[in-house]
């Protein structure tokens, strides 16, 4: 199959403790993390490094921070020049979040890749997350000053005042 300007979307977990009322996956969560077999690694390596893949988006039908081991394994499959995206609520404490950002930065810099961290700013998540990651993440990305890592926010909310 020839890929052309393709988005490769990989769900790495079905574990989530947030329990958003809008979530279409809540009743389907198996509470399992993806495990990469050798065959899966080879298939993903081929897909990730295919010249027709524009971006590799890592998320979950849950919170992908619960499966960082596999996320880092996937990053390491790159042959270089891959644009990754990590979609998360960023619910962990700030110290752990900074450690995650630094680990991602180290891997992508060693491979010659880039990674955009997309933090949720859904009001459903904000109400349930004790460690608000948004302001902290903005500060850390300014300090990090890494041209290969970027930060963005995503929301399903239509309340523009909330997402400002």
Where are these regions (language model features)?
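Conserved glycine-rich "GG(E/T)P / GGGxP" loop and the immediately following alpha-helix
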Residues: 2-13, 21-163
């Amino acid at each position: 199959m020839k890929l052309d300007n393709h988005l490769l979307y990989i769900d790495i977990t079905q574990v989530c403790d947030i329990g958003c009322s809008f979530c279409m996956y809540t009743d389907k969560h198996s509470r399992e993390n993806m495990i990469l077999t050798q065959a899966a690694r080879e298939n993903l390596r081929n897909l990730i490094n295919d010249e027709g893949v524009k971006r590799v988006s890592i998320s979950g039908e849950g919170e992908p921070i619960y499966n960082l081991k596999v996320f880092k394994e996937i990053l390491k499959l790159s042959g270089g020049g891959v644009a990754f995206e990590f979609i998360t609520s960023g619910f962990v404490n700030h110290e752990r979040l900074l450690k995650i950002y630094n680990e991602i930065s180290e891997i992508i810099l060693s491979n010659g890749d880039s990674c955009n961290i997309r933090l949720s700013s859904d009001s459903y998540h904000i109400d349930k997350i004790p460690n608000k990651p948004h302001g902290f993440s903005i500060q850390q990305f300014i300090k990090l000053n890494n041209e290969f890592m970027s930060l963005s926010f995503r929301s399903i909310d239509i309340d523009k005042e909330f997402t400002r």
